[in-house]
């Protein structure tokens, strides 16, 4: 076993969830410790802040989609992408079946929840590609709280992790949940 280095900090891109399984399995099996790494895994208060927190040197590493790294570099942060956790993020549009949303085109006239600085841009770009005017729906910044926002009727649909928020919402509402993978 190697000598442990000082603590290394890793800021997740979200609350801990199945997406992060490889990180926690490696910690549980002692793989970091075997490499001399004393890893502190942290969750963000707001996933939008991760690249800035890493860029300011407040943590050693952070998880974010590549688009956020590019944007942070454009803002002057000296960040480097060193790997990927999954080939494709498990994100998509999530809504209760009772909302009537079955396809991306069904967002017209609806309130669409998004996360972070790029969420609205992503929704609008996808809408334009689908031939939908961005003025035909309302966007609402909801942060990490998609299930809560849907349950409190703040949004009809939103971008979220299909591997756990879809399950969480179905559990909270006892209702079938629609999802459309965005990749």
Where are these regions (language model features)?
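Short, glycine-/small- and polar/acidic-enriched structural segments
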Residues: 2-152, 156-161, 179-181
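Phosphate/pyrophosphate-binding betaalpha-module
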Residues: 167
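Extracytoplasmic/periplasmic substrate-binding proteins
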Residues: 170-183
């Amino acid at each position: 076993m190697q000598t442990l280095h000082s603590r290394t900090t890793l800021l997740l891109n979200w609350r801990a969830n199945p997406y992060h399984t490889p990180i926690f399995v490696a910690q549980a099996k002692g793989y970091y410790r075997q490499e001399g790494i004393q890893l502190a895994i942290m969750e963000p208060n707001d996933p939008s802040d991760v690249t800035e927190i890493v860029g300011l040197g407040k943590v050693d590493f952070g998880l974010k989609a590549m688009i956020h790294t590019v944007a942070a570099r454009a803002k002057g942060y000296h960040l480097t992408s060193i790997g990927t956790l999954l080939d494709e993020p498990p994100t998509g549009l999530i809504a209760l079946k009772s909302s009537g949303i079955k396809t991306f085109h069904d967002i017209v006239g609806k309130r669409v929840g998004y996360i972070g600085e790029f969420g609205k841009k992503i929704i609008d770009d996808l809408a334009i590609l689908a031939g939908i005017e961005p003025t035909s729906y309302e966007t609402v910044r909801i942060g990490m709280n998609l299930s809560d926002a849907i349950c409190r009727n703040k949004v009809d649909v939103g971008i979220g992790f299909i591997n756990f928020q879809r399950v969480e919402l179905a559990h909270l509402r006892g209702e079938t949940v629609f999802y459309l993978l965005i990749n």
